[in-house]
Each structure stands twice: as C-alpha cells, then as structure tokens.
Design a protein with these regions (language model features):
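Active-/binding-site microenvironments in catalytic and ligand-binding cores
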Residues: 2-329
Length: 329
C-alpha cells in the first residue's frame, strides 16, 4: 500500500490481482474521481514539484502536425482535409473534414478500449459509450488538464550506445529489463504521478521512409514498442505512473509477442496490453508523440525530467484526442 498527500491509500498490483470477481486486476472504485483514472496520482504537491523541473525555460511541443502520418500505420485513419473559406475580402475561416482524433500525436481515453473479460473501466455499461454521453470521455482531462512531472527514458539512445539499435522494421519488442536499464543509465528515479515518456526513435524513423515503404510497413502490421508482460503492467502501477506515452504507433509492440499473458483475456486485441491499462487500471496512453527534439535537448543538458502539460480537446465523450502536450525544461 502507498498513500498520496491527500491521504488516499492505493494497493500494490499484487493486491489488485487479489480483489474479488470482476475487480481482480483493476483499479475500479479506487480513485476519488471515477472517470479520471491514474492522472489522479498527480496531487497539488506533485504539480508544485514539477515546476522545479523548469531549469532552462525551453519549451517543446510534443505533437506532430495533424496530417503528419499520411500514410500512417492505421488501416482506417487518414489525414484530415483542411479548408479555408471567406465570407468577404476581410474574412478568413476554416474547418477540417475527415479528422480522426487519434490520427497523429494523441492520448487514448478510457473509453478507447473495452476489456473483453470485464467490460469498460469502472464497469461502465456498454450502452453508455456512445456519442453524446460523458462517461469516461476525454473531456475530464480537458476540463482539468493533466499537468505534472514528465520523465523521459531514452531507450533509443541507450540501445545505440550499446551497439544494438532498435530494429523498427521488424517491430522489435522492448522488454521491461531494457527500459529499466535505460532509466538506470540516466540515473532516473520515478515518483508517484510521473508522466512516463519512452523515446524509441520510431516516429522519426517512420516519417523518414518513402511513401511506398511506409505503406509496406503499415501492411506488415509491425511496429516496435513495449513488450507485453504482466511484469510491465505491475511495474507501471506500482510506480504510480499517471500516463505512459511513446513516440511510436501503439506504445506497445505490434504484433503482440507470442508469449503475451493477455491472449486469453484480450482475444479481440490478440493479447495487447491496451485493455489492461485503459479498461482495468484507468491508465491513459500517449501515442505518436514527438519526443526526438526533447530527448536530444535532455541528453545535452543531462536532465531527464520536465514540466509536462496534456490538454485534450474538450469533446464530450471522445474516445481519444490530440494530446496537445507541452514539455518545459
């Protein structure tokens, strides 16, 4: 058990697994704001402490352009079409058509995934997850943005230093031991409420490919990312992470590793961890973040934390949103 500055006590992941019935392995009912999820780990004191991460006053936008991934890895999402129009010579206005809210840098909301075995987060009925309803929508994080200490683990840099660069074309799984080793090489210590950013180098690698090779990579359904394991899920919860974000397609690797322990409980996702994080723990995931410039700056300064803000679009009931994330070092 660990407690926050508000006095709220949270069990270990092992204890979560020992909860009864549908509650086993979930954080359902543990947070004061039922729809906020693990960003609840960020307390006012955490935000004040995060302000101490501002040392150089350098600001980084962590979102790629809305049309950056065209083509991208998604079989469905396309780049939006931007139209500018005028009512008279002194006026300009604009709109977007075909805007997929998770088509570029994004944050996955808690209604983005339903656990095959127990349903949506907090037992929210399936019928409540539709347009025009608020339950589990990203508007919760728009009305009270996620602001806290962001820590960047440069797995890409660590692997290069070891002489074993990540094989993005093969969709290399990145295991917990590797992520821990990279964090230890940076002398990183995690705190409750941290926003974890994992720099893999995947986005910059993918965006540098010719269009035809991007399409081939999309069709291969391979993307490097975190290896699926019960150990990683436990580690994320026990470190009280508020958000996990990465500069790759799905945070976790695709396809899921054959040994994924979630193949039986997440058959529709072929053993991905998305259901564990979103539907069971209430832990939002950030995907396709622009972390390269921030990582290079942090390496140059030797400081691997920053004040990070995440302000999704205020769309009631959205399943996800552009992350609208900023880091200040």
């Amino acid at each position: 058990m660990t407690s926050t500055e508000s006095g709220t006590t949270y069990p270990s992941y092992k204890a979560l697994l020992e909860r009864e019935g549908q509650l086993a392995g979930t954080s359902w009912g543990l947070f004061p704001d039922a729809g906020r999820g693990t960003p609840s780990f960020i307390q006012p004191g955490s935000v004040r402490d995060a302000a101490g991460c501002v040392r150089t006053g350098t600001v980084f936008g962590l979102d790629y352009p809305a049309d950056a991934f065209d083509p991208g890895m998604s079989l469905k999402r396309r780049a939006p079409r931007h139209t500018i129009y005028s009512a008279h010579p002194a006026h300009r206005d604009d709109f977007l058509d075909g805007y997929y809210l998770q088509g570029s840098s994004q944050i996955d909301g808690l209604r983005h995934r339903r656990a095959d075995d127990v349903g949506f987060y907090n037992g929210t009925p399936d019928g409540d997850i539709r347009e025009g309803t608020a339950a589990l929508g990203v508007q919760v994080w728009a009305e009270q943005p996620i602001v806290g200490r962001g820590v960047l683990v440069d797995v890409d840099g660590y692997c290069r230093d070891q002489g074993t660069p990540i094989d993005h074309a093969a969709g290399q799984p990145l295991g917990l031991n590797l992520i821990r080793a990279a964090a230890e090489a940076q002398s990183l210590a995690f705190r409750p409420g941290d926003i974890l950013m994992i720099h893999t180098g995947w986005c910059e690698w993918f965006l540098a490919l010719p269009a035809g090779e991007k399409e081939s990579q999309r069709d291969s359904r391979r993307a490097s990312g975190i290896e699926q394991s019960a150990e990683f899920v436990a580690w994320a919860w026990d470190n009280r992470l508020a958000v996990i974000a990465a500069d790759n397609f799905a945070v976790e690797c695709l396809p899921p590793v054959p040994a994924s322990p979630f193949r039986a409980t997440a058959p529709n996702d072929h053993g991905m961890m998305h259901q564990q994080f979103l539907a069971k723990l209430g832990l939002p995931l950030g995907e396709l973040w622009q972390l390269g410039p921030l990582s290079r700056h942090m390496k140059a300064t030797g400081s691997w934390d920053a004040l990070v803000t995440i302000k999704p679009l205020n769309i009631t009931g959205a399943t996800g949103s552009p992350a609208n994330a900023t880091a200040v070092t």
